[in-house]
């Protein structure tokens, strides 16, 4: 009888050991969130621009309340992030959604952390762009710029905090995938790929900022498009095409802005050099090329009609 008990105990221990070794093992790169960023519409349900914008605003508010920014930088970072159009995070989230409609790895991926990252990077660049040593702007989004309200030193530190937190958000996105999507192929490789690509893109944006070219705008759309594609489990072989789509969209976005600022811009402005009509034609051609690629990769959805129209409206001044 005693032998049977010993044998039973050994069998149970073996089963526990096998179960443990078969369970996916991972370590967290980041501390877990104290609150969920969003509860609401299922990640794969279709959404219009307004719904996406409201969803991201909720994500942003929760992230700020959860302590994405610390101490004296909380107020200027929060101030800088309010009132945006959120077009870059919306693009990222929609590309992830569209990719997963074609193929998925178990639970749907919810890219809230990645969406925060791309917005943080973008807003950091706006803070720097407005500084006295660059454009010396005192107004943005119908309110004081960050440096004008909080001073140059806090503006510089806020831009740095936003950038650093953006990389933290990417790491948090990888951790989220590890915990919620066990069939996702090699999340650690994903994290390394995203951080390397983002670092390269931010370097390009910085170089573009120094010479005041579209290269200060396009890299942030490349981050949104390519992070969305990779997180949505799009193929690595197609990244070049997605990057081309992002370049076309970013170029159209910048040139539409040049048309809008034709009469007030004192820096380099394509519309002032080539005329509004020719510039508008390039905007339309760039959007058409972007649309063609998105169709080819089967990620063109109805919300893109709204996104493209917003760019056209900027160019038309409506």
Curated annotation (Swiss-Prot):
Q: Per the record, a Pfam family?
A: polyprenyl_synt
The entry's localization annotation reads: Host endoplasmic reticulum; Host membrane
Keyword hit for Endoplasmic reticulum: no
According to Swiss-Prot or TrEMBL, what is its membrane topology? Answer: Single-pass membrane protein
Residue positions binding dimethylallyl diphosphate? 140, 216-217, 254
Q: What cofactor does this protein call for?
A: Mg(2+)
What does the entry say induces or represses the expression of this protein? Expressed in the late phase of the viral replicative cycle.
Q: Which InterPro entries match?
A: Isoprenoid_synthase_dom_sf, Polyprenyl_synt
Query: For this chain's UniProt record, which GO biological process terms are given?
Result: farnesyl diphosphate biosynthetic process; geranyl diphosphate biosynthetic process; geranylgeranyl diphosphate biosynthetic process
Pathway noted in the entry: Isoprenoid biosynthesis; farnesyl diphosphate biosynthesis; farnesyl diphosphate from geranyl diphosphate and isopentenyl diphosphate: step 1/1; Isoprenoid biosynthesis; geranyl diphosphate biosynthesis; geranyl diphosphate from dimethylallyl diphosphate and isopentenyl diphosphate: step 1/1; Isoprenoid biosynthesis; geranylgeranyl diphosphate biosynthesis; geranylgeranyl diphosphate from farnesyl diphosphate and isopentenyl diphosphate: step 1/1
Q: Which GO terms describe its molecular function?
A: (2E,6E)-farnesyl diphosphate synthase activity; dimethylallyltranstransferase activity; geranylfarnesyl diphosphate synthase activity; geranylgeranyl diphosphate synthase activity; metal ion binding
Q: How far does the signal peptide extend, from start to end residue?
A: none
Q: Which amino acids does the record list as binding isopentenyl diphosphate?
A: 85, 88, 122, 141
Q: Which residues cross the membrane?
A: 1-21
The principal localisation class reads: host cell
Give the function comment from the record.
Answer: Trans-prenyltransferase that catalyzes the sequential condensation of isopentenyl diphosphate (IPP) with different allylic diphosphates, such as dimethylallyl diphosphate (DMAPP), geranyl diphosphate (GPP), farnesyl diphosphate (FPP) and geranylgeranyl diphosphate (GGPP), farnesyl diphosphate being the best allylic substrate.
List the protein's name: Trans-prenyltransferase
